[in-house]
């Protein structure tokens, strides 16, 4: 029966299982012999057990498991030997003896085990034995077996390496220099073995070998960890011996995987203080690394680590004699220079780290930040980059770069001090410029940054011009209406932050802003010009407040209203009607309230402009009713007109109301006009209400007449009730022309018509309205106010 093919994983598990079983058998025998004090037999079983490590069949992962199992058993042997030597057994004989083991792998593992025990028992032999052991390990040149053997040597000697602060006889026991030499040599040899792994086996297994090498890298890195743990390794020794030795090995091995891992290892395991004193040699080595090494990640890791160190509250910070930013700036430039094929996004990533470093270590040095931006501009010029696509990696990195100053300063005015910020902005394509412009404006709004001068306004407007004016590179298709409205609302809100303490300066700021916004095209100005008009009205009120200290305030107010008029006119040219109409009405109110010289003329002009817009531009009946109601409401609040101007305006309102297309609209507008003849005010009566009772009655009678002409019965009754409420209002305001008889007639009319309406939700609403009106009258009749009219004779 044919056997089924095993998967590589199953094969590995089977081989490992067999090896572990053999280890268990031999270790059991070894321990039995040790318990019976049969040392020679025990060593024979130990040698057999170690023979399992001679295999070439296991993957690094499986070999590691086997190695760990054997290491644990060897520890038992080490403890036994230590006890024996303490009792007086001769070590020298044993050290000689294990050298006769048949195979080199078992022999060297046993030599290390015995050698370590020897050193612990007789420290005076330490220097020679350590040298002996590290040299002997050269005997195993198979990468996998050699790496684990040397790792065993490193682990076993962990606690016996000479270090600072212990009494020593340097001739025999060695000193810190011997420890550094020992670990550096072991590191160099392990790195060579590790690098050599890539050349073993078939080229088709290359990817698998690279994966296996990745798994084994920690064995090589452990040497660097060991060096960093030696107390005797101070800054001076690190600079002169340790780093020099490591970098020499790293640069010379010419292997990208090893170089990248070991450089990152150096950054991680040694203290920040050491890195600060050795920046130049480390960064110079970066420039010499293999072309396939991702140098960017190495440099960024170092920069980020030192930036954190500088930022630590409890730390000493960066020593003043170390020009950290300058060193990194120069060395990063050298690295970029030495790597012509470095991807553009990696080049920008390095600048991102540099700018982070400048921000964290030198928060007050705006020039350092600008230096990074300038370098980036120069790099882009060399690469002939322009309009970088939003989707590209370079665009993402450039976005990160430019967001850092925005987020760190949280003040656009500081960002504007960076001369190279705007030039870099221009490298983006349309989409990226637009999203970055939104980002900048959102930051201004979030932090309420006030823009206080014309130059600042100019600079910001130019920076975010993608939101303010059409661009040559913008897409042909129309933008999404919602997105467009959101972007423009952002700009509109920003206008309210253009404010100077000095009113004259504020006027110049608004003028500058209008120049930019005026060129925005019809779609944009409906969002951007109205806030500008309101800002102008606010400024006019400020001049009024300053009238005691500024004798030219009235002329300045006229100038402001002229500015507002021009700005609103631009909206009319953009074929907008309702928006400019509202702005003219607001202007008329403002002019009337401020009361500067010529204010009546200005207010009249603004009112008549609103009328012109109403008559010429608004044709939709709903919009017409809303507009005339607004005009009447605004005019009713104004008290700056003489009778000469007030009379034609109120007549005009009444006329316009009666000319509305739909009868219900006419009725409502005409009845609203009644208020103009009652509570309207002019200068001839010193601002007191007109109280023209007769004209009020004329309006209300006309409204009733119009309501009578309505064909829809429910609409007709509804209008009657609304007009009844107007009558009641004026009766309570003590208009003599409105009598109880008039009220009774209208109530009777409504009572007659209501039952004829078809049953519906609308009819229910009408009934409710009428009921509420009668309830009001009932309450007034039963408990009349002392000053109010008496409802005597009212029939309810």
UniProtKB/Swiss-Prot annotation:
Keywords: Cytoplasm, Endosome, Membrane, Phosphoprotein, Protein transport, Transport. Residues 500-693 are annotated as: Interaction with IGF2R cytoplasmic domain. This is Vacuolar protein sorting-associated protein 35. GO terms for biological process: endocytic recycling; intracellular protein transport; mitochondrial fragmentation involved in apoptotic process; mitochondrion to lysosome vesicle-mediated transport; negative regulation of inflammatory response; negative regulation of late endosome to lysosome transport; neurotransmitter receptor transport, endosome to plasma membrane; positive regulation of dopamine receptor signaling pathway. The keyword Metal-binding does not apply. The keyword Hydrolase does not apply. GO terms for cellular component: cytosol; early endosome; endosome; endosome membrane; late endosome; lysosome; mitochondrion; mitochondrion-derived vesicle. It is found in: Cytoplasm; Membrane; Endosome; Early endosome. It comes from the Eukaryota. It is a peripheral membrane protein. It comes from Bos taurus. GO terms for molecular function: D1 dopamine receptor binding. Residues 25-44, 205-215 are annotated as: Interaction with SNX3. Coiled coil: none annotated.
């Amino acid at each position: 029966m044919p056997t089924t093919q095993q998967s590589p994983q199953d094969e590995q598990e089977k081989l490992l299982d067999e090896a572990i079983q053999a280890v268990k058998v031999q270790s059991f025998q070894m321990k039995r012999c040790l318990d019976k004090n049969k040392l020679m037999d025990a060593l024979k079983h130990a040698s057999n057990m170690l023979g399992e490590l001679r295999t070439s069949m296991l993957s690094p992962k499986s070999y590691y498991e086997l190695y760990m199992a054997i290491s644990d058993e060897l520890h038992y042997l080490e403890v036994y030997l230590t006890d024996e030597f303490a009792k007086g057994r001769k070590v020298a004989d044993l050290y000689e003896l294990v050298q006769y083991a048949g195979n080199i792998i078992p022999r060297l593992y046993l030599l290390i085990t015995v050698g370590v025990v020897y050193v612990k028992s007789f420290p005076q032999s330490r220097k020679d034995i350590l040298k002996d052991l590290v040299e002997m390990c050269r005997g195993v040149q198979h990468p996998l077996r050699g790496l684990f053997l040397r790792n065993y040597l490193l682990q076993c000697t962990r606690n016996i390496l000479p270090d600072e602060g212990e009494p020593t006889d340097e001739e025999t026991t060695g000193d810190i220099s011997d420890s550094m030499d020992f670990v550096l040599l072991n590191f160099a040899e392990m790195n060579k073995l590790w690098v050599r792994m890539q050349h073993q086996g078939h080229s088709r297994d290359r990817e698998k070998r690279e994966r296996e090498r990745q798994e084994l890298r920690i064995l090589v890195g452990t040497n660097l960890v060991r060096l960093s743990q030696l107390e005797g390794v101070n800054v001076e020794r690190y600079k002169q011996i340790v780093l020099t030795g490591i970098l020499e090995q790293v640069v010379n091995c010419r292997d990208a995987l090893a170089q990248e891992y070991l450089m990152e290892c150096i950054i991680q395991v040694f203290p920040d203080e050491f890195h600060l004193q050795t920046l130049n040699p480390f960064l110079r080595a970066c420039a010499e690394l293999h072309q396939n090494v991702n140098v960017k990640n190495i440099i960024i890791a170092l920069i980020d680590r030192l930036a954190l160190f500088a930022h630590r509250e409890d730390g000493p910070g960066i020593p003043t004699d170390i020009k950290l930013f300058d060193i990194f700036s120069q060395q990063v430039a050298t690295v970029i220079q030495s790597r012509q094929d470095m991807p553009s996004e990696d080049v920008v990533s390095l600048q991102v780290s540099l700018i982070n470093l400048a921000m964290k270590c030198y928060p007050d040095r705006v020039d350092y930040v600008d230096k990074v931006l300038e370098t980036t501009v120069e790099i882009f010029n060399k690469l002939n980059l322009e309009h970088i696509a939003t989707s590209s990696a370079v665009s993402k990195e450039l976005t990160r770069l430019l967001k850092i100053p925005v987020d760190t300063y949280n003040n656009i005015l500081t960002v504007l001090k960076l001369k190279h910020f705007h030039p870099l902005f221009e490298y983006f394509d349309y989409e990226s410029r637009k999203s970055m412009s939104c980002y900048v404006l959102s930051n201004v709004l979030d932090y309420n940054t006030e823009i206080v001068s014309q130059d600042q306004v100019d600079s910001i407007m130019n920076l975010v011009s993608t939101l303010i004016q059409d661009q040559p590179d913008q897409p042909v298709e129309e933008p999404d209406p919602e997105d467009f409205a959101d972007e423009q609302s952002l700009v509109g809100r920003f206008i309210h932050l253009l404010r100077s303490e000095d009113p004259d300066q504020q006027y110049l700021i608004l003028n500058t802003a209008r120049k930019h916004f005026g060129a925005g095209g019809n779609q944009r100005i409906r969002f951007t010009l109205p806030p500008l008009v309101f800002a102008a009205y606010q400024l006019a009120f400020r001049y009024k407040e300053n009238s005691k200290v500024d004798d030219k305030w009235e002329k300045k107010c006229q100038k402001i209203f002229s500015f507002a008029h021009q700005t609103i006119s631009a909206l009319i040219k953009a074929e907008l009607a309702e928006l400019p109409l509202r702005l003219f009405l607001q202007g008329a109110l403002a002019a009337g309230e401020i009361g500067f010289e010529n204010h009546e003329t200005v207010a009249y002009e603004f009112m008549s402009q609103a009328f012109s817009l109403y008559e010429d531009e608004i044709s939709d009946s709903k919009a017409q009713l809303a507009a005339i109601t607004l005009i009447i409401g605004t005019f009713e609040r104004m008290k700056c007109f003489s009778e000469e101007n007030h009379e034609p305006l109120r007549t005009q309102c009444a006329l316009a109301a009666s000319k509305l297309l739909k009868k219900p609209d006419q009725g409502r507008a005409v009845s609203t006009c009644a208020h103009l003849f009652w509570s309207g005010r002019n200068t001839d009566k010193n601002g007191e209400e007109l109280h023209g009772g007769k004209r009020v009655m004329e309006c209300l009678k006309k409204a009733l007449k119009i309501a009578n002409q309505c064909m829809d019965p429910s609409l007709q009754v509804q209008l009657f009730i609304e007009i009844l409420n107007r009558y009641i209002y004026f009766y309570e305001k003590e208009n003599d022309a409105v009598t109880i008889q008039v009220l009774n007639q209208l109530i009777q009319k409504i009572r007659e018509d209501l039952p004829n309406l078809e049953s519906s939700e609308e009819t229910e609403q009408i009934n409710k309205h009428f009921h509420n009106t009668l309830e009001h009258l009932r309450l007034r009749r039963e408990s009349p106010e002392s000053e109010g009219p008496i409802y005597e004779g009212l029939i309810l």
